[in-house]
Structure formats: structure tokens, C-alpha cells
């Protein structure tokens, strides 16, 4: 089993179960089928911040600034980043960051994602603005 990103990064913050214990039981042959996978009543949204030109030609080595608030409903996963000798986070790949946020509905989750993305800066940052339009259109409050 492979837990891909951004899929796993989007789902894991919603889990209220000790997932490591369930994986350990599975790997050791002790999964008995009555384990509960509890999840939050919130929804989760993810948008990738990539380098301009990805997936073709893109430049790396640009300093990244993070000006966003901290919250348990915000996770920023580093994919294509590195840290230089001075401790500065740099862009170091095509898919640079995954910004994942939770909310009570898809609109609030995606609005928070785009707010956080607006507070992250590096030269050539690019992110799609049409992510999630399908669920935002098809799900109303309480339908998730």
C-alpha cells in the first residue's frame, strides 16, 4: 500500500483514530476487523504550491517566506524544499508545498487554503485556483 500525496495529506488530519496502531496490527497479522476508523466531522482541502514552469522547466533555490497564522486546521507539507546553511527554507523542486486545511464545509476549507497560500511567497509560486470546484458545487452544508 502506498499513501500518496496529496491524498494522504488531506485525509490524515481528519482521523481521530491512532492510525499507527491499526497499521501495526495489519502488518503483524493481528487485525481482527472490529477496529474503528473514527474521523472528524470536518472536511479537508488541499492545494499544491508549485514552481513556475512545473512539470517542464522550473528554477529552484528561491527563499520561501511563511506569513500565515498557526492553527490546528492548517498543515503545510514540504515536498520540494531544502534548507540552506543559514536555515532559510528554499524551493527545491516542482511541487514545492502542499497546503491542507480543514473546515466545517468545503467552502470554508478551500477559503482557508487560499488564504494561507496568499501568505506564502517564493519567486515563481504557482497554484491552481480551480481546485475543489467540483465538491464546492456538489456538496452543500451537511452533505459531506
Language model regions located:
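Active-site "cap" helix and flanking loop/linker of ATP-utilizing ligase/carboxylase catalytic domains
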Residues: 1-73, 84
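Generic C-terminus detector
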Residues: 81-85, 90-144
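Generic beta-strand/beta-sheet core signal
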Residues: 48-50, 79, 102
